[in-house]
Amino acid sequence: MTDPIAPLTSKDINTAKSAANEDAIVAQMRTFIDALKKHNYAYYVLDNPILEDSEYDQLRRSLLELEEEYPDLIQPDSPINQVGDMPLSAFTQVTHDIPMLSLGNVFEYDDLRDFMRRVNDRLSVAQQSPEYEMELKLDGLAVSLKYAYGKFVQAVTRGDGQTGEDITQNAKTIRNLPLWIPAASDIELLEVRGEVLMPKAGFERLNRLAEEKGDKTFANPRNAAAGSLRQLDPAIAASRPLAFYCYSVNQGLPEHIKTQSAALAWLKTIGFTVSAVEVVQNPREAQAYYESVKETRGDLPFEIDGMVIKVNSLALQQQLGFLSREPRWATAYKFPAETVMTRLHAIEWQVGRTGAITPVGKLEPVKVGGVTVSNVTLHNFGEIQRLDVRAGDMVSVHRAGDVIPKVTRVWTDQRPENSEPVKLPSTCPVCDSPVVLPKDEALARCTGGLFCPAQQVEALIHFVSRRAMDIDGLGASWLISFFEHGLVKTVADIYQLHNHQEELITLEKLGEKSVQNILSAIEASKQTTLARFIYALGIRGVGETTAQNLAQQFGDLDALMSASIEKLLLTPDVGAITAELTYKFFRAPHNIEVINALREAGVHWDKVEQVASEGLPLDGQTWVITGALDSMARDEAKAKLQALGAKVSGSISAKTTALLAGDKAGSKMAKAEKLGVKVVGEEEFLVLVGE
């Protein structure tokens, strides 16, 4: 006999009513959330709103009222959470668990076939040619997202591939980015990667509003997306029409999924937006799909700049592995460069860091390859003469990928009757010093030197740049402002800015915290390397590689400063012109004064460990490296050659002993063959260095 059922108390009845009421409230919340998410997808991704603004606002208000009344019942994926958090003071740097590598590029059908052939060659002969998966190459900002047991916890930009910026608070505001994934609630860590982009219609709306307010507009959707994600105030990012498209799973993929296409299908089922996918078997099918997308890409709601082609099998991807900067199993098939016609209204002359006078064409603004172009470099006076380009001409402007736009043709049949040939200015447009065009040089130059304000400012900008003294946060705009306010004239003055802290704080938009950050970065930059310091000085003809070679050759700044032209010529990559320019630089009283001031300010570096090449296997040899190596980065290969006594140069000449050629060796290979320079493959190189 079972025990009789105990009678319900009034407390039990109230608890039951409360539970039922909670279920009803949650159900109502879910109805609002699902409707809002559906609208957000239609609006921000498809650009096809399904609700009027007033209907959307009413839905949102209804959900917000419920959440304010029942905060304990707020759902983890509520769109109310996507409105922006407190502003940040700075972005945190995060190291990627798995590097975010870039892709190699192909531009023609023959390149595509070569890519697939290389894939086949690397796979076992017993295997059939693999199938490939093709995706749209979205033109946005690459980011990595992490979810812990289904909850969104972190977003990081690609950065340099190894380290990116934590943009979690901004990413939370992206309307189609899921904050909670029920289907992934049992996955300890899910990492997905994709592109944050701005749909074309949203971009046009954003720029239209900016124009109405008199604010600066964005050049293209990609810049707008990147700029939105890098706002310290998440509320600004929340106001921008951003969308996230997922293209890979890097951690947490269920084991039963074996292909890239299946991975994207799974991502779609759990709540992510993915682009169109096509599986192909060979180059011919890949080309057909590429052509079809190229013809219809204008109908897409977002910008793309090509296709991405991946080996579909995840196991084969693992087998094929990676080069130092890109996977062997994937490549980008870029769309051809776009060429458009527009009018060139004027030609202006700019002055660079070394006094180079460069002509810049001012165009009627025109969209080329997704970017609005209003300026175009004309390189030098010789190029102007070659093109016979004049103010008022109709010109063809060409742009491929991220390459700087250039004029490829002048339509002389449409030239105005009153046009006149362009003349090289006789005086500097900034300081009025005489302009000279040295014999055997393409660039005209201002003779004003550091008397010329333009050269002074450009020298300052170069000095603080990432590959020089790397003074983080001290950008061009601040340097120009400091220069105009008389706080800096030479690079040595940068290290005296701590004496002007109050003046810096009073400058427009530069608060106490920003000033402190800049001063801290300046202080940190005092510990550098001799090679960086030499490069930062901005000696004409001395790039990064030459600066490294000079540091290694002389080992000491004083030895370099006192070196004769004959001794300078013993340095790899230093020819007669660079040797003479370097020699003269270190004998100019002003330059010596600046260098002494930098040292007195505390700029220093560790002693250079010079490699004694005498008696080493490659002593007296000069090598050049080209292409991508499978086994190591090129810098590592360079170090191994130097350890054996070789000099490593950046250019091929008759004096070159050997060319180390990796994958995708380009014009240097052809030049080596023409000059009869020995070409060494990677396997032979590894034997040479004992690996």
Swiss-Prot record:
Under the heading SMART domains, the entry gives:
BRCT (SM00292), LIGANc (SM00532)
- Give the matching PROSITE patterns: BRCT, DNA_LIGASE_N1, DNA_LIGASE_N2
- Specify whether Mitochondrion is a keyword of the entry: no
Q: Which residues form the BRCT domain?
A: 613-691
Q: Does the keyword Cell membrane apply?
A: no
Keywords, A to Z, come to: DNA damage, DNA repair, DNA replication, Ligase, Magnesium, Manganese, Metal-binding, NAD, Zinc
Active-site residues? 137
State its Enzyme Commission number(s).
6.5.1.2
**Chain residues that bind NAD(+):** 53-57, 102-103, 135, 158, 195, 310, 334
- MF GO annotations: DNA ligase (NAD+) activity; metal ion binding
The record's Gene Ontology biological-process terms are: DNA repair; DNA replication
Instruction: Look up the record and name the cofactor or cofactors this protein needs.
Output: Mg(2+); Mn(2+)
Name the positions where Zn(2+) binds: 428, 431, 446, 452
Q: Name one GO cellular component term.
A: cytosol
Source superkingdom? Bacteria
Pfam families per record: BRCT, DNA_ligase_aden, DNA_ligase_OB, DNA_ligase_ZBD, HHH_2, Nlig-Ia
Q: Which reaction does it catalyse?
A: NAD(+) + (deoxyribonucleotide)n-3'-hydroxyl + 5'-phospho-(deoxyribonucleotide)m = (deoxyribonucleotide)n+m + AMP + beta-nicotinamide D-nucleotide
Functional summary from the UniProt entry: DNA ligase that catalyzes the formation of phosphodiester linkages between 5'-phosphoryl and 3'-hydroxyl groups in double-stranded DNA using NAD as a coenzyme and as the energy source for the reaction. It is essential for DNA replication and repair of damaged DNA.
Q: Which HAMAP family match?
A: DNA_ligase_A
Identify its protein family.
Answer: Belongs to the NAD-dependent DNA ligase family. LigA subfamily.
Protein name as catalogued: DNA ligase
Lineage, broadest ranks: Bacteria, Pseudomonadati, Pseudomonadota, Gammaproteobacteria, Moraxellales
